[in-house]
Amino acid sequence: MTVTPSGSNGAGSAAPEGRKLLRLEVRNAQTPIERKPPWIKTRARMGPEYKELKSLVKREGLHTVCEEAGCPNIFECWEDREATFLIGGEQCTRRCDFCQIDTGKPSELDRDEPRRVAESVQAMGLRYSTVTGVARDDLPDGGAWLYAETVREIKRLNPNTGVELLIPDFNGDPALLAQVFESRPEVLAHNVETVPRIFKRIRPAFRYERSLAVLTAARDDNLVTKSNLILGMGETPDEVRTALVDLHEAGCDIITITQYLRPSPRHHPVERWVKPEEFVEFAQFAEGLGFAGVLSGPLVRSSYRAGRLYAQAARLKPAATPPVS
């Protein structure tokens, strides 16, 4: 998944509670937090829908990734009545070098979480909801039931709300993937995040080809598919274009392309700041390949304008039906 904050104040090189720093984290921390270029900025546009949701979330004690990850796009997404929820707990059984979610032993599975998320979607009056979560390799089903049940509960309470489900790879297990696909989210997302050459370094518990296979399986089940690429972690422009070709050939319908923002000193250093005009060029390349939906920019995140991208892709994929607005 893609969970990166809007930036870091430079703190955070200390080990997370309950474990020591990994050797990789110690090495990462030797590089100071990078100064962001002037184009990495966002304006707070607090419209009436945003203000209403902000008040409701605070009053009801609801939790969204939008707020907790400090997403720079919260103002736009909430104005569109879109939000993202994290399921499965606060500890992930895998560690990706860009992700702010901590690695450790997860808490027990909370079987009531799907209902609570669905009620939050209902309370917020969302038009489109994105659900993401941690990897749960500690569970026999890898958390497949939790992901599928959350979609079912959201749809039961909110029949006119679109649901985008961003999943781990479930180790490529066809039965577990089928269990998740049967919940029929409007969009099935699985993020590749980076290019083959540096994939193992950045995402050691995942496999590039396996991630592509997850998207192919979802495509074959007639789901609208989506993925994400994070730039600035050491890839070259040619490698980005090759990854886009791979994703399109694997059956990916929607692609988002983003700039890596380092969550803390113990995370992978920013190798370079990709210029806005480069993001435009990558978007044009992706559109030329035939992706049904493309968003590319320094502050784009994988769930940014998710409902709009789905509606755009659905028009080009007749089996998909956009949610009622």
Curated annotation (Swiss-Prot):
Query: Keywords for this entry?
Result: 4Fe-4S, Cytoplasm, Iron, Iron-sulfur, Metal-binding, S-adenosyl-L-methionine, Transferase
A GO cellular component entry from the record: cytoplasm
What GO molecular function annotation could you give as one example from this UniProt entry? Answer: metal ion binding
- Which positions fall inside the Radical SAM core domain? 78-292
- Pathway as given in its UniProt record: Protein modification; protein lipoylation via endogenous pathway; protein N(6)-(lipoyl)lysine from octanoyl-[acyl-carrier-protein]: step 2/2
Binding site residues for [4Fe-4S] cluster 1? C66, C71, C77, S303
Cofactor(s) needed: [4Fe-4S] cluster
Protein EC:
2.8.1.8
| Residues that coordinate or bind [4Fe-4S] cluster 2 | C92, C96, C99
What NCBIfam families does UniProt report for this protein, alphabetically?
lipA (TIGR00510), PRK05481.1 (NF004019), PRK12928.1 (NF009544)
Write down the HAMAP family for this protein, in alphabetical order. Answer: Lipoyl_synth (MF_00206)
Q: What is this protein called?
A: Lipoyl synthase
- The encoding gene is lipA
